[in-house]
Amino acid sequence: MAKEEKRVVAQNRKARHDYFIEQTIEAGIVLSGTEVKSIRAGKVSLKDSYANVKNGEVFIYGMHISPYEQGNIFNKDPLRDRKLLLHRAEINKLIGYIQQKGMTLVPLEVYFKNGKVKIELGIAKGKKLYDKREDIAKRDALREIDRRLKENFR
């Protein structure tokens, strides 16, 4: 059996800064052919995108896929809502999570796995300003420790 490859195309770095990621889940996505070609070319942005459950189905909103240059009439709207592919049990679990106060679904990354486009969704809770400052302070402290250790081993 072939090894599963995971080639990350786009990441939502802002999501990890703005939210506490409680859990992640992998979902497929319904796309047209020209959208897949644009994603292969890396022309996708997850900035300001989010996912939500509507009528028992999960959709992603605000995900920008640039039109494919050679696609002409087959290109779709770059910001259209796109359906995510999940099992019913997974959707029910997501509904339970996002009905809790302060919880939301945030796309973390888009990647290819065995030739199929996948999205990693994070079940997230928003950070307050002081939480963000705390994370930045921790990161700076770790960076300083690494710098000092590197100097000592020279």
Swiss-Prot record:
Keyword flag Cytoplasm: yes
UniProt-listed Pfam families: SmpB (PF01668)
Any single GO BP term: trans-translation
Domain of life assignment: Bacteria
A cellular component term, taken from the record's GO annotations: cytosol
Molecular-function GO terms, alphabetical: RNA binding
Coiled-coil intervals, chain numbering: none
Keywords: Cytoplasm, RNA-binding
Function: Required for rescue of stalled ribosomes mediated by trans-translation. Binds to transfer-messenger RNA (tmRNA), required for stable association of tmRNA with ribosomes. tmRNA and SmpB together mimic tRNA shape, replacing the anticodon stem-loop with SmpB. tmRNA is encoded by the ssrA gene; the 2 termini fold to resemble tRNA(Ala) and it encodes a 'tag peptide', a short internal open reading frame. During trans-translation Ala-aminoacylated tmRNA acts like a tRNA, entering the A-site of stalled ribosomes, displacing the stalled mRNA.
Family to which this protein belongs: Belongs to the SmpB family.
Name assigned to this protein: SsrA-binding protein
Native species: Acetivibrio thermocellus (strain ATCC 27405 / DSM 1237 / JCM 9322 / NBRC 103400 / NCIMB 10682 / NRRL B-4536 / VPI 7372) (Clostridium thermocellum)
